[in-house]
Amino acid sequence: MSGTAVARLLLRLELPSPGVMPPPPTDYDYGGPISDDEFLASAMATEGPTVRYDLFPQNNSQPTLQIVLNHTEVQTDLQYPHYEDLGLDPDPNWTRICEDVYNPLLENNRIEFWVCGVLINIVGVLGILGNIISMIILSRPQMRSSINYLLTGLARCDTVLIITSILLFGIPSIYPYTGHFFGYYNYVYPFISPAVFPIGMIAQTASIYMTFTVTLERYVAVCHPLKARALCTYGRAKIYFIVCVCFSLAYNMPRFWEVLTVTYPEPGKDVILHCVRPSRLRRSETYINIYIHWCYLIVNYIIPFLTLAILNCLIYRQVKRANRERQRLSRSEKREIGLATMLLCVVIVFFMLNFLPLVLNISEAFYSTIDHKITKISNLLITINSSVNFLIYIIFGEKFKRIFLLIFFKRRLSRDQPDLIHYESSISNNGDGTLNHRSSGRFSRHGTQRSTTTTYLVATGGPGGGGCGGGGGNNSLNNVRLTQVSGSPGLVKIKRNRAPSPGPVVYFPAREMQRSASTTNSTTNNNTSIGYDWTLPDSKKLGHVSSGF
């Protein structure tokens, strides 16, 4: 260090309790150059335990020496590794306790505006819209399943996380660079931060463990299908979601006591400034080392990352093996494999977008260093991770995409892509008072075909009724015209083309039926199967119904 320098002394204040703050720190400037010995002697002679000295060379704006007396009682950079969680600068030396931070020429304000004020807000709004659409589609009756309920819970957590990200990082980053939204920056943000910040941390933890739960559910369904009947049920999925939320709430409960709101009257102006500052708990070195660094790293990153990596490797191996034997897979097994492939993409995106935050937390925990630009990018990546699942569902989820088009583009699809359904049905007399009704349908849409076969057991009122209902020739069953097959008195056959459906999703049987409260076992042609009782409008019962749709 050179022999002469210009020294500037900045008096640091111990953070008081919430309330009106005392006058701002006082700056002392020495007009001429002083020697190192004079500087150190002046520093040691100053009273008060919270004094910091910044030594500036004459031709440099950056200090070459910083001396903090009794630094365990003051706020140091090392004690604030997570100020970015609140959108605050980790070193409050540059500002008063509360200060108007509007400065469009400051590089940090410009970067924060474009990364947080623009990108986080745009991505967040689109992500909220996508998650709402995902929740609507996944909650449809035809999408009712354990995995879809878990994905709905994941969308809920991601939506809350995006909202808190916008409130904490997106909107407050606009004012320091543009001068707009001062009312939010000064009168809203400081008062909601003590509650919104812990809610955001709860949502982040819940989102991570919902991703873990989804992967675990897919692992059981793909690798242990026999256990899936007991473990992967709709009721258990609700329990898994509640457990994840309760665990996240319990783990992040101390966050509610980490920050507080302070007020400061601007000297010479009729304005009261508000800002957020860390509480005494948040300034505790033990709390920071144990809870902020190690617990956060282990609970939010190490445990879920390692578990997700292992489970997805096992799922990928099973999917790869199944693809080699795809010809021998049943339709339900192919559907499970396709769903597992889609969720593999979800987890891969999760790894990619959370890798930088993981590196950043490791750097803070072990090296006590932090780059504010990287922190802002890290917050953006976490927001993107909570916003992209809808796109993955649209790209890889065939049924999800079909229902999405049906809900939001129903009229256009009906006009531009009419459906063509070929329907065939046959009814034979069993000779014991019942009819064996077999129907098949072929559904053509967008150049593809889908077939279904349905078997009914219809009571006719007595054996040998001469066809259907004891009549000969033509009869009517549920508004369906039956034609007697010549030479076969016990066989009635129907063949017709059904009118186009209003959308791409078709349910068979298409006639109006009401589902009774009970399920029964019915026997058709000596084949026993389990199904639902269906009741026609004329009170005739249909036995087992099995649909290939």
UniProtKB/Swiss-Prot annotation:
Glycans are attached at residues 59, 70, 93. GO terms for biological process: adult locomotory behavior; behavioral defense response; flight behavior; G protein-coupled receptor signaling pathway; larval locomotory behavior; neuropeptide signaling pathway; positive regulation of cytosolic calcium ion concentration; positive regulation of synaptic transmission, dopaminergic. One of its GO terms (cellular component) is membrane. Disruption phenotype: Deficits in simulated flight behavior with fewer or shorter duration of wing beats in tethered flies. Dopaminergic neuron-specific knockout leads to shorter flight duration. RNAi-mediated knockdown, either in adults or during pupal development, results in similar deficits in simulated flight behavior, whereas knockdown during larval development has no effect on flight behavior in the adult. Pan-neuronal or dopaminergic neuron-specific RNAi-mediated knockdown leads to significantly shorter flight bouts. Keywords: Cell membrane, G-protein coupled receptor, Glycoprotein, Membrane, Receptor, Transducer, Transmembrane, Transmembrane helix. The chain crosses the membrane at residues 118-138, 159-179, 182-202, 239-259, 290-310, 342-362, 377-397. GO terms for molecular function: neuropeptide receptor activity; peptide receptor activity. Residues 139-158, 203-238, 311-341, 398-549 are cytoplasmic. It is a multi-pass membrane protein. It is found in: Cell membrane. Residues 1-117, 180-181, 260-289, 363-376 are extracellular. Expressed in ovaries, heads and bodies. Expressed in dopaminergic neurons. The keyword Nucleotide-binding does not apply. The keyword Repeat does not apply. InterPro entries: GPCR-Ligand_Int, GPCR_Rhodpsn, GPCR_Rhodpsn_7TM. It comes from the Eukaryota. Belongs to the G-protein coupled receptor 1 family. A receptor for the FMRFamide peptides. Reacts with high affinity to FMRFamide and intrinsic FMRFamide-related peptides. By stimulating intracellular calcium signaling through the inositol 1,4,5-trisphosphate receptor, Itpr, in dopaminergic neurons, may be involved in the maintenance of neuronal excitability and in the regulation of flight bout duration. This is FMRFamide receptor. It comes from Drosophila melanogaster. The lineage of its organism: Eukaryota, Metazoa, Ecdysozoa, Arthropoda, Hexapoda.
